[in-house]
C-alpha cells in the first residue's frame, strides 16, 4: 500500500460528509481533476447533498449516492450540461476508498458520486477519479455494506448525508448559486404550497339533474356517490330503545295548548301498552327458540348414541363372524391335511398373551419381606454345585471320539451338528461339574499393574536413527581418509626406498671408479 500512496499525487482540497453511519473525510485532487472537484465543492456549498441518501450499495464493489431524488436517475452538475471526463495517468481505481463521478456514458457527469470498496480496474478510464477517503473514516464507509439490501442493490434502510462541511477550498472564485438559508426557505415554501394544494382539493360537485327534462331517469341510472354526508352529533336520546321524548319534543309539547293534553296522554298510554305487548311477544319468541335448540341438541345426542351402539354392535358381529370363518377354515384344513403335517396351536392375539403374562406375574408375586424361600433355594443350588463331581464317563467318551477335520480336536463342540440332535437329555447334570478356567494372568493386567519388561516394547527413536546415520557417514569418510593416507604413506616409502637404492648404487659406482683409478695409478 505504501508504494500505491507514493504514486498518487498530493491533494489540495478536503470535504467532510456528516452521515448517519459516521463522518467521511474526502480529500480531493483539485489539480488533476479541476472540473469534478469544483462541481463537488460548489454543490456542497449550496447544500445540494443535504438529506440525500446512498441509494445503491454493492458489497465488495462500491457505495453510490448524491442523487436528491433518491432513485439513481436524478442529479445535475453546476454546469449547464454534464462536464467532460477527466483522466490522469497517476490516478487509477486500484484500491478501496477512492471517490469517482457516476455517469451514464462518456462526458455525461452530474452530481452523483461513488466510493469504491475494493480494487476496480474496470472503472479506470471510464469514470473520473477525483478524491479519496482519508484516515479511519473509511471504516464508516465499510460499515454501510452490513446493511440489508434488496434485489436491486438498494438498501432497505439507506444511510443519509445529514450535512457537508468544506475544510479546504482551493477555488476562491466559487460563488454558490443559492445559499443554504435560501434553500431552506425554498423548501419551506414548497411544503406550504403542497399543503395549500391539498386543502384546495374539493369533493366532486353533484350533477344537477333536476334541471333536465329527463332528470328523474338520469338520477336513477346515476351510481351512488361515495361522499360522506355530514350529520349532526347524536345524543343519548337517539340511541334509546324506548320512545322517550327528546328535549325538543318536550319543548314543543309545552308550547301546545292545554286542550290537547288529554289526547297526548291517551296516545302515550297506547304506546306504552303496545311496547309491553311487543316485549311479551319477544320474550315468548326467545323461549320458543331456546326450547327448539334444546330439542335439537337432545335429538343429536340420541342419534350419536345410537350410531355408537350400532357401530359397536356391527364391529362385534364382524369380529365374531371373522372368528367363525377362521374356525371353519381350521376345521377344513385339519380334515384335509395329512398326518405328516403337524397340528398347529390355536393362535391367540397379542393382547391375550400380555394379559396372561401379567396375570401369572400377579399370581407369583410374593409378600413383602418374605424371601426365606428364595434364600433356601440359593443355598441348595450352591451346595449342589460344590458337591458336583465331573462325569468321567462323558469326558472319556469325548476323548475317545475321533478328532474333527477342521480343528483336529476330539469331541470338538464347534464342529458338532446341533440340528441333527432330535432329542436332548434335559436331565444331564454334566454342566454343573463343568469348570471355566482361563489362562493364568502373568502380567497382572486385570489388577491394572504394569509388570511388562522393557523387552516387550519396541522403542523407535528418530534421534537414534539420525545419530546412527551420522556415525556411519563419519566412519565412511574416516575409512576413505585412512585408505588415502595409507596409500600416500606407501608411495612415500616406495619413493624413499627407490632413492636409497639409487644413492647406494651411485656411491658404489663412485667407489669402484676411485678404486679403479688407484689401481691404474699403482700399475703405472
From Swiss-Prot:
It catalyses: [protein]-peptidylproline (omega=180) = [protein]-peptidylproline (omega=0). Its EC number is 5.2.1.8. Keywords: Cytoplasm, Isomerase, mRNA processing, mRNA splicing, Nucleus, Rotamase, Spliceosome. GO terms for molecular function: peptidyl-prolyl cis-trans isomerase activity. Residues 506-515 have a biased composition (Basic residues). It is an enzyme of class 5 (isomerase). Residues 329-338 have a biased composition (Polar residues). One of its GO terms (biological process) is RNA splicing. This is Peptidyl-prolyl isomerase cwc27. It comes from Rhizopus delemar (strain RA 99-880 / ATCC MYA-4621 / FGSC 9543 / NRRL 43880) (Mucormycosis agent). The lineage of its organism: Eukaryota, Fungi, Fungi incertae sedis, Mucoromycota, Mucoromycotina.
Amino acid at each position: 500500500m505504501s508504494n500505491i500512496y507514493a504514486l498518487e499525487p498530493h491533494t489540495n482540497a478536503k470535504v467532510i460528509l456528516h452521515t448517519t453511519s459516521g463522518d467521511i473525510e474526502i480529500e480531493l485532487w483539485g489539480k488533476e481533476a479541476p472540473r469534478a472537484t469544483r462541481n463537488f465543492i460548489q454543490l456542497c456549498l449550496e447544500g445540494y447533498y443535504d438529506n440525500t441518501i446512498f441509494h445503491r450499495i454493492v458489497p465488495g464493489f462500491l457505495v453510490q449516492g448524491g442523487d436528491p431524488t433518491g432513485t439513481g436517475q436524478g442529479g445535475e452538475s453546476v454546469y449547464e450540461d454534464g462536464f467532460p471526463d477527466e483522466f490522469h495517468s497517476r490516478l487509477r481505481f486500484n484500491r478501496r476508498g477512492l471517490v469517482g463521478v457516476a455517469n451514464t456514458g462518456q462526458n455525461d457527469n452530474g452530481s452523483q458520486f461513488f466510493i469504491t470498496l475494493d480494487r476496480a480496474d474496470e472503472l479506470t478510464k471510464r469514470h473520473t477519479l477525483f478524491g479519496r477517503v482519508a484516515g479511519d473514516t473509511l471504516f464508516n464507509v465499510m460499515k454501510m455494506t452490513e446493511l440489508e439490501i434488496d434485489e436491486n442493490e438498494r438498501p432497505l434502510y439507506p444511510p443519509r448525508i445529514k450535512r457537508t462541511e468544506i475544510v479546504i477550498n482551493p477555488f476562491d472564485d466559487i460563488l454558490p448559486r443559492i445559499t443554504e438559508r435560501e434553500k431552506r426557505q425554498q423548501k419551506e415554501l414548497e411544503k406550504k404550497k403542497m399543503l395549500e394544494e391539498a386543502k384546495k382539493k374539493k369533493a366532486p360537485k353533484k350533477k344537477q339533474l333536476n334541471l333536465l327534462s329527463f332528470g328523474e331517469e338520469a338520477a336513477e341510472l346515476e351510481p351512488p356517490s361515495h361522499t360522506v354526508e355530514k350529520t349532526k352529533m347524536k345524543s343519548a336520546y337517539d340511541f334509546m330503545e324506548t320512545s322517550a321524548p327528546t328535549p325538543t319534543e318536550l319543548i314543543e309539547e309545552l308550547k301546545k295548548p292545554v286542550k290537547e293534553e288529554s289526547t297526548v296522554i291517551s296516545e302515550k298510554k297506547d304506546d306504552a301498552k303496545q311496547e309491553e305487548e311487543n316485549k311479551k311477544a319477544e320474550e315468548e319468541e326467545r323461549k320458543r327458540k331456546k326450547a327448539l335448540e334444546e330439542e335439537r341438541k337432545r335429538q343429536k345426542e340420541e342419534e350419536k348414541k345410537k350410531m355408537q351402539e350400532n357401530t359397536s354392535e356391527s364391529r362385534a358381529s364382524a369380529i365374531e363372524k371373522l372368528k367363525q370363518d377362521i374356525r371353519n377354515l381350521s376345521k377344513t384344513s385339519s380334515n384335509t391335511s395329512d398326518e405328516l403335517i403337524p397340528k398347529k396351536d390355536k393362535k391367540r392375539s397379542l393382547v391375550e398373551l400380555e394379559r396372561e403374562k401379567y396375570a401369572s406375574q400377579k399370581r407369583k408375586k410374593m409378600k413383602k419381606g418374605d424371601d426365606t424361600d428364595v434364600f433356601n433355594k440359593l443355598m441348595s443350588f450352591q451346595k449342589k454345585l460344590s458337591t458336583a463331581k465331573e462325569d468321567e464317563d462323558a469326558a472319556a467318551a469325548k476323548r475317545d471320539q475321533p478328532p474333527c477335520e477342521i480343528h483336529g480336536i476330539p469331541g470338538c463342540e464347534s464342529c458338532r451338528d446341533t440340528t441333527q440332535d432330535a432329542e436332548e437329555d434335559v436331565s444331564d447334570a454334566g454342566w454343573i461339574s463343568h469348570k471355566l478356567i482361563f489362562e493364568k494372568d502373568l502380567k497382572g493386567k486385570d489388577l491394572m499393574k504394569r509388570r511388562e519388561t522393557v523387552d516387550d516394547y519396541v522403542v523407535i527413536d528418530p534421534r537414534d536413527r539420525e545419530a546412527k546415520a551420522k556415525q556411519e557417514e563419519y566412519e565412511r569418510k574416516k575409512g576413505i581418509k585412512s585408505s588415502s593416507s595409507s596409500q600416500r604413506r606407501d608411495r612415500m616409502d616406495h619413493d624413499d626406498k627407490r632413492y636409497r637404492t639409487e644413492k647406494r648404487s651411485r656411491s658404489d659406482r663412485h667407489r669402484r671408479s676411485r678404486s679403479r683409478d688407484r689401481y691404474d695409478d699403482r700399475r703405472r
